[in-house]
Amino acid sequence: RIVEEYQAKNQRIVYKKIENKGIAANTNAAAQLAAGEYLALADHDDILAPHAMYTMGKAVLQLRRRKEPDGFVYSDEALFSKSIRRPIAAHFKPDYAPDYLLCCNYICHLAVFKKALWDAVGGERPECDGSQDHDLFLRLLERTGGAAHVPQVLYYWRVHAGSTSGGTEAK
């Protein structure tokens, strides 16, 4: 109901109920509905800072003005359980570090990238469910040659049983 209320007020909001075919397949289905120039991956139970999209968009525009690659931008994140006012931990990430990214997905959330890049690599691969974002980021960044880091906590990742925010054994 909440989504339908927002959808009635803003035609840019698209909602489509689909069967659960796994995280990668469902993310691919959602990306097909997107009409914008950029995509951002977010989980259904996490929270964006109120200024997250503005800040990421501003970062893209600044990159364009400097004639730097603007295909991939990521931010810092915080983990929370009950309230974002009391984070459990913060992930203050390094600037783009390709060797480190090969070892682990330090980017996670919030990542914003060009939809044309997503389309070029074919989106997420269902056979990579569990590490689908890491696989995607490696393939996207192979094309962009790098990413820009916004050193601000813009994404709040909810920690709960069954979520990888609490540990990878949930996969």
Where are these regions (language model features)?
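Conserved donor NDP-sugar-binding/catalytic core segment of glycosyltransferases
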Residues: 51-87
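Conserved nucleotide-sugar donor-binding catalytic segment
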Residues: 97-171
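The conserved acidic donor/metal-binding loop of glycosyltransferases
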Residues: 43-47, 76
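Acidic donor-binding segment of Leloir-type glycosyltransferases
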Residues: 1-17
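Short aromatic/hydrophobic "clamp" motif used to bind/position activated sugar donors
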Residues: 39
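Acidic/His-rich active-site region of diverse nucleotide-sugar glycosyltransferases
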Residues: 72-108
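GHKL-family ATP-binding catalytic core of two-component histidine kinases
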Residues: 35, 49-50, 114
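Glycine-rich, basic loop-to-helix element that forms the pyrophosphate-binding segment
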Residues: 18-34
